């Protein structure tokens, strides 16, 4: 009984689409990352420049405008997206366009944006998994076939090619169309546009107009052979522009293409254009172009002014216009060998077009940008003669023009207009680019692209004279007689000079190729000032990226700040900081222009002396040190401090105490005392919480009343007279907020034009209503109902189900996000330290001029720690009374909120992510505050004190990404990292890397003398491999060991090997397995290397270079060495070499002596031992999994069991669970299989068969599986009896960490019987009751299978965590159906997540 939980979502972008989605005028980018849907908006941002000149001509402007991506919403999908398209529909809710998504297994989903919910709304889901379409035994399964989705540019219909030759056609209603499907009639007049709705299957006729309930008509499925009987092997299809009826082009062949049969099947591709008659469900062939090159693989429809279609092949580009006229260009020397089609020769470019992505750059010129699989960019230019294309020219972009921005292959692209284009990648970061163009002709300088008509005419005139020479070649219609006019690539006049630069990027850590654990290196010397640095026991390092983008990624489950200094802080309970201006009180200058000497930073520490007394110690920050500051007038009565801040443009320091408010000057001399008691009744009152926003102070008193103070121009405080409702109200929490985004300001119509942001006061009443007041006029802007019901949407309407409510302790309105784009969020804190995050948005209602304030609930699956003792519970209660949420306006250029206590956490958000809760490394944080202006290295840092009486000055770790649920740091290597291992003795990492290199046949081969006569300039590429040593102190390469040509690194492992047969000494070694790949006709060989990372004399300027690889042993073997593992207790290793698995021992002479072996079958890619047991698994890529045992007296390998399903093993790992032994296997279809070795089961034939217990679809292609120990989570510690002996047994549990090519990281956890029953019932309830994005079914997506007897289906942890996102009433309702308490379910959810990895 196991549970699969996705810890990190996929990060590689698979699809991208530009669409006006949120509104009719919005600029949105929709991004798909395998099974995650993200909706971005393009935001124009003003960036600051620090002077300088451009080419010495003119000074730069102070600010420059750039474009950034801002995430609107994110949705995990229960399906794998295979394509996306945009569709114009009738009467969308947002006014924008709809999104059509195609999923694996022949599903289509139509979604639109719902502005009232600030999210997507599913319009329809279409299934095409009918049995009659896939009944043929020779037709492959739908999941094994590719799919193509294309939508007509006028959105009249969509075609979906699934299976092999099945074509689904989905018509859409459009204004003024003449659609008649079956019995449907549609007549629409111009006056009826505002009254058109949707249509589902029956007409609702009323007088002279037809009203539809859905935007689509009935779809139908046709075989492609119904269009043309010769379409037997479809390749690609796409709808074309500038046709009155829906028209698309199909690229296909009548016989299967084959490079091996190229002489017989040369030029076998056809391109045919069909127009659809939706009324008759028929098609008409408009044109057909035969005998096209056999390596064409894609159709790209081109908009005006070029028009037609571009056909992309491995060696050429072919353009076909609407009349069927073709223009082609060959881009390497193989184009003339593989095809007799007429094309212009640009073979000197030597381009490889496999896996390329093409996107048009401008609607005016028709230029295209081609991104190759290497990441290099090529500009494609069409010579236009009026509306006719007279030629194609290509020019690679140089590096100085941005041609090498993409480090690896692109997977998708989107044209965003205004000189912007987006390229998504699965192997590197996805980038948003901007481009500018300049003329390449110095004689005739051309203006920028704004003048469309003149540019197009000039391009035609300039290129006409040159292209006349090649006119005959370009218009030749007989492919049998090639006319290859050779033209150097440099002569591409008419091709403009484009310069690209990066505007923004989406970080990607995929594909994750290998993973290992290592000890974190201390980058700071442990001096007297550094008492203790909180860090994890181990760190998780993964090899990520492809090609030049290869590198490492450091994964941290919690934030480990860079500590600059730490101090002993005995009995310190709180820390505050205050920055004052030392000048004459001039207004603050921007952060970029401030000078440190103009400001002074105070640090105030609070030490309790009695239950109601605290001593305040004042220090001045001097770089990284704290110097005591004498301030006799600062809190002389030792009252308890509630809040400290500054007012009057940082000229006054304000200290809010329980009984009074004290105001000080910049030298902390007392300026004013303002009492907290009620002046009307003279009753003694005490302050409970406070909120500061210059020039106001909002104080909440112990009788739940509000006190509002305002500072005048001189800094003196005076109480603001409140209106009757505010003064008489009983409040639970108060907060002041400057509305920079103007979201709250737009909720009430106003006649005056706002020139600056406004200040708002948020009050949470005792009955949990949120009142929004504008200051200074105290106008009530909005009242949000049912806050404690925690519904998905908070608005002015009371939730329908409001009987069950959560007990809230605090509500805060604060900015979250990056400094250039903070957005307001409502953060609610419950009594149990649960954090609920809402994002504010303004929803518009038709017929009203102003908008309404609403809040949408953000996902937060981080559970608070459960306290384990009465002492901790008591300290937690004291903290909750005195220490509230801390608002951090700017910490490392991020606006954040911090929650102190046992679950000390930051709430962080970047522009490209949702809010995430990151734990601060450590157990208990008493107080935290911003620490700024000390030194450049500590700018925008923070200072905090923990339960170990340590005060630390630190900042967020540098170069760390907070876009995901874990803190990530990417380290570039510049080469693809295929394997890595941690050398424990030297505390370094050894990488197996590779880079592309040209391959040439050896001239000295005696068996093949004909190789010497080969004349070729376009050489094939192979991977040149090497070993590198990386120091974790600086994350730089300190040593390298190159391997021979055609020798590939297949495995790198760290092992504790016996190095002497006489002394039996054992040392830590790095074992490397390689394979020599000389070609399929030459038997493969391999080699086993044994290295030791030794200590050497370092470079004085580089002290980290004190380690080097030393070759200890080397053994050439027959067959490729594909997998390695340590085995047994004598320091031996087991290697998969060819079709054998052999146990070897290292001899003193460096050779590896075989002692035992086992015959395998095809290709062994997994060999692992359950450490210390001698039991091992061997996974074959084709023939399944073997479970064997190794014995040392005598040396032999024994087969215990084998799976009977012939699984295609991609990765495998043991998973012990008590007295049961499970084996997890990931196959090539993204499935996870659970096998069990149980010789007592009759079905196992005395253990000869591994029993298949369950099957689970992960949705991601697994790359590694790693068995990790599991630590007890806080709920298990709290429930465990300290005197019980079961504590030790609970800690002996394991988890399996799974990485994938998409960048996702998952974990499989064994679940006890009682918890499994609860979670299984909860999963069934959530599957049936939740509204799933795009209408998908999680149960069908996971395709959970089990043997039905002893086996249980695997649980979906991500689906279970959605229970936390529900409203309080529904949450309790489902818990009651499951028959469990809320704390039981939370404890179960904590156990299946990442909390069990307490050492990371």
Curated annotation (Swiss-Prot):
Compartment(s) where it occurs, according to its Swiss-Prot or TrEMBL record: Nucleus
GO (cellular component) term, any one: nucleus
Residue ranges, annotated region (Disordered): 436-472
Keywords, in A-Z order: mRNA processing, Nucleus, RNA-binding
InterPro entries for the chain: Beta-prop_RSE1/DDB1/CPSF1_1st, Cleavage/polyA-sp_fac_asu_C, RSE1/DDB1/CFT1/CPSF1, WD40/YVTN_repeat-like_dom_sf
Gene3D superfamilies for the chain: 1.10.150.910, YVTN repeat-like/Quinoprotein amine dehydrogenase
Any one GO biological process: mRNA processing
Molecular function via GO: RNA binding
Task of the protein: RNA-binding component of the cleavage and polyadenylation factor (CPF) complex, which plays a key role in polyadenylation-dependent pre-mRNA 3'-end formation and cooperates with cleavage factors including the CFIA complex and NAB4/CFIB. Involved in poly(A) site recognition. May be involved in coupling transcription termination and mRNA 3'-end formation.
PANTHER family xrefs: DNA REPAIR/RNA PROCESSING CPSF FAMILY
Family of this protein: Belongs to the CFT1 family.
Protein name in UniProt: Protein cft1
């Amino acid at each position: 009984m196991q549970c699969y939980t996705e810890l990190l979502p996929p990060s590689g972008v698979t699809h991208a689409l530009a669409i006006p989605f949120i509104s009719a005028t919005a600029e949105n980018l929709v991004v798909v990352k395998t099974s995650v849907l993200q909706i971005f908006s393009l935001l124009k941002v003003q960036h600051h420049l620090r002077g300088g000149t451009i080419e010495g001509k003119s000074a730069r402007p102070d600010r420059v405008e750039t474009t950034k991506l801002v995430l609107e919403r994110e949705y995990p999908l229960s399906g794998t997206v295979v394509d996306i398209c945009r569709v114009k529909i009738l009467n969308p809710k947002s006014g924008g366009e709809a999104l059509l998504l195609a999923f694996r297994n022949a599903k289509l989903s139509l979604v639109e944006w719902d502005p009232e919910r600030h999210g997507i709304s599913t319009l329809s889901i279409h299934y095409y998994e009918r049995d009659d379409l896939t009944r043929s035994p020779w037709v492959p399964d739908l999941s094994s076939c590719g799919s193509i989705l294309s939508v007509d540019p006028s959105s009249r219909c969509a075609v979906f090619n699934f299976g092999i030759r099945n074509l689904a056609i989905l018509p859409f209603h459009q204004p003024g169309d003449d659609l008649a499907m079956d019995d449907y009639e549609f007549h629409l007049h111009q006056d009826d546009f505002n009254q058109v709705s949707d249509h589902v299957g029956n007409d609702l006729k009323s007088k002279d107009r037809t009203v539809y309930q859905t935007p689509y008509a009935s779809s139908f499925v046709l075989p492609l052979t119904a269009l043309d009987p010769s379409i037997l092997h479809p390749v690609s299809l796409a709808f074309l522009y500038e046709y009155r009826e829906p028209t698309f082009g199909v690229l296909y062949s009548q016989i299967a293409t084959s490079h091996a049969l190229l002489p017989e099947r040369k030029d076998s591709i056809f391109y045919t254009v069909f127009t659809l008659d939706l009324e008759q469900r028929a098609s008409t062939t408009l044109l057909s172009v035969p005998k096209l090159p056999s390596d064409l693989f894609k159709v790209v429809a081109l908009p005006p002014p070029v028009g037609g279609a571009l056909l992309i092949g491995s060696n050429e580009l072919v353009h076909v216009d609407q009349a069927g006229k073709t223009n082609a260009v060959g881009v390497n020397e193989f184009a003339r060998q593989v095809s007799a089609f007429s094309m212009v020769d640009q073979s000197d470019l030597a381009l490889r077009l496999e896996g390329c992505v093409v996107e048009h750059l401008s609607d005016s010129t028709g230029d295209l940008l081609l991104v190759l699989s290497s990441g290099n960019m090529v500009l494609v230019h069409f010579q236009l003669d009026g509306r006719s294309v007279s030629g194609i020219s290509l020019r690679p972009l140089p590096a100085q023009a941005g041609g090498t921005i993409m480090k690896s292959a692109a997977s998708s692209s989107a044209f965003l207009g205004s000189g912007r284009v987006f390229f998504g990648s699965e192997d590197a970061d996805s980038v948003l680019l901007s481009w500018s163009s300049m003329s390449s002709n110095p004689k005739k300088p051309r203006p920028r692209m704004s003048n469309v008509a003149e540019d197009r005419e000039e391009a035609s005139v300039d290129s006409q004279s040159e292209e006349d020479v090649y006119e005959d070649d370009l218009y030749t219609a007989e492919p049998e007689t090639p006319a290859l006019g050779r033209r150097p690539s440099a002569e591409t006049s008419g091709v403009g000079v484009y310069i690209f630069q990066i505007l923004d990027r989406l970080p990607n850590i995929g594909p994750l190729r290998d993973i290992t654990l290592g000890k974190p290196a201390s980058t700071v010397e442990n001096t007297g000032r550094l008492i203790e640095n909180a860090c994890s026991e181990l760190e998780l390092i993964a090899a990520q990226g492809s090609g030049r983008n290869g590198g490492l990624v450091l994964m941290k489950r919690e934030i480990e700040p860079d500590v600059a200094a730490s101090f002993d802080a005995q009995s310190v309970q709180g820390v505050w900081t205050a920055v004052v201006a030392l000048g004459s009180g001039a207004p603050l200058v921007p952060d970029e222009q401030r000078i440190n000497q103009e400001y002074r930073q105070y640090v105030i520490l609070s030490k309790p002396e009695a239950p109601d007394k605290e001593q305040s110690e004042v220090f001045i920050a001097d770089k990284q040190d704290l110097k005591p500051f004498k301030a006799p007038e600062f809190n002389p009565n030792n009252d308890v401090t509630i809040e400290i801040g500054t007012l009057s443009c940082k000229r006054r320091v304000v200290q809010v105490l329980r009984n009074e408010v004290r105001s000080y000057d910049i030298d902390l001399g007392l300026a004013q005392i303002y009492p907290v008691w009620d002046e009307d009744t003279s009753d003694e009152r005490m302050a409970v919480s406070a909120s500061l926003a210059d020039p106001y102070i909002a104080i909440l008193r112990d009788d739940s009343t509000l006190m509002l103070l305002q500072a005048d121009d001189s800094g003196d405080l005076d109480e603001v007279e409140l209106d009757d409702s505010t003064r008489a109200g009983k409040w639970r929490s108060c907060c002041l907020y400057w509305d920079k985004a103007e979201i709250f300001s737009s909720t009430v119509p106003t006649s005056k034009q706002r020139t600056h942001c406004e200040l708002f006061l948020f009050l949470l009443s005792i009955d949990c209503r949120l009142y929004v007041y504008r200051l200074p006029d105290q106008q009530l802007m909005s009242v949000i109902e049912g806050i404690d019901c925690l519904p998905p949407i908070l608005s002015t309407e009371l939730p329908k189900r409001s009987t069950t409510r959560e007990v809230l302790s605090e509500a805060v309105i604060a900015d979250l996000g990056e400094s250039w784009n903070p957005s307001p969020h409502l953060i609610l804190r419950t009594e149990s330290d649960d954090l609920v995050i809402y994002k504010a948005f303004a929803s518009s209602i038709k017929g009203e001029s102003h908008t309404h304030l609403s809040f949408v609930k953000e996902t937060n699956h981080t559970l608070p720690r459960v306290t384990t003792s009465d002492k901790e519970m008591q300290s937690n209660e004291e903290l909750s009374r005195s220490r509230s949420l801390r608002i951090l306006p700017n910490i490392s250029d991020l606006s954040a909120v911090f929650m102190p206590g046992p679950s000390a956490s930051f709430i962080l958000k970047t522009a490209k992510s949702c809010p995430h809760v990151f734990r601060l490394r450590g157990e208990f944080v008493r107080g935290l505050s911003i620490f700024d202006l000390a030194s450049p290295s500590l700018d925008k840092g923070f200072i905090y004190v923990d339960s170990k009486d340590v005060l630390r000055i630190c900042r967020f770790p540098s170069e760390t990404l907070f876009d995901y649920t874990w803190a990530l740091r990417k380290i570039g290597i510049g080469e693809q990292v295929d394997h890595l291992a941690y050398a424990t003795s030297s505390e370094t990492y050894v990488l197996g890397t590779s880079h592309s290199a040209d391959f040439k046949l050896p001239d000295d081969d005696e068996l093949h003398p004909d190789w010497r006569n080969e004349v070729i300039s376009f050489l094939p590429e192979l991977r040149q491999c090497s070993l590198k040593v990386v120091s974790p102190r600086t994350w730089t390469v300190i040593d390298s060991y190159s391997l021979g040509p055609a020798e590939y690194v297949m495995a790198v492992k760290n092992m504790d090997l016996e190095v002497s047969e006489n002394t039996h000494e054992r040392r830590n070694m790095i074992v490397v397995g390689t394979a020599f790949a000389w070609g399929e006709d030459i038997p493969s060989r391999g080699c086993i290397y044994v290295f030791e990372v030794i200590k050497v004399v370092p470079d004085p300027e580089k002290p980290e270079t004190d380690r080097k690889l030393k070759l200890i042993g080397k053994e050439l073997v027959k067959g490729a060495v594909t997998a390695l593992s340590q085995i047994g207790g004598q320091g031996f290793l087991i290697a998969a070499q060819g079709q054998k698995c052999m146990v070897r021992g290292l001899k003193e002479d460096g050779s590896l002596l075989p002692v035992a072996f086992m015959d395998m079958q095809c290709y062994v890619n997994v060999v692992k031992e359950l450490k210390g047991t001698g039991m091992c698994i061997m996974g074959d890529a084709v023939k399944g999994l073997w479970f064997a045992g190794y014995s040392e007296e005598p040396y032999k390998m024994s087969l215990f069991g084998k799976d009977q399903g012939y699984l295609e093993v991609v990765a495998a790992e043991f998973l012990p669970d008590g007295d049961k032994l499970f084996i997890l296997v990931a196959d090539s279809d993204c499935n996870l299989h659970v096998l069990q070795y149980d010789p007592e089961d009759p079905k196992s034939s005395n253990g000869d068969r591994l029993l298949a217990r369950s099957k689970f679809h992960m949705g991601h292609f697994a790359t590694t599986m790693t068995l990790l120990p599991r630590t007890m989570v806080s709920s298990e510690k709290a429930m465990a009896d300290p005197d019980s002996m079961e504590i030790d047994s609970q800690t002996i549990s394991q988890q399996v960490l799974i990485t994938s090519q998409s960048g996702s990281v998952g974990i499989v956890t064994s679940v006890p019987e009682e918890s499994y029953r609860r979670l299984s019932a909860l999963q069934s309830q959530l599957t049936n009751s939740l509204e799933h994005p795009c209408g998908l079914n999680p149960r069908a997506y996971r395709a959970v299978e089990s043997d039905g007897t002893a086996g249980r289906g695997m649980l979906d942890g991500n689906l279970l965590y959605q229970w936390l996102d529900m409203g309080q009433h529904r949450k309790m309702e489902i818990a009651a159906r499951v028959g469990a308490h809320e704390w039981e379910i939370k404890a179960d959810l904590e156990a299946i997540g990442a909390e069990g990895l307490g050492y990371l």
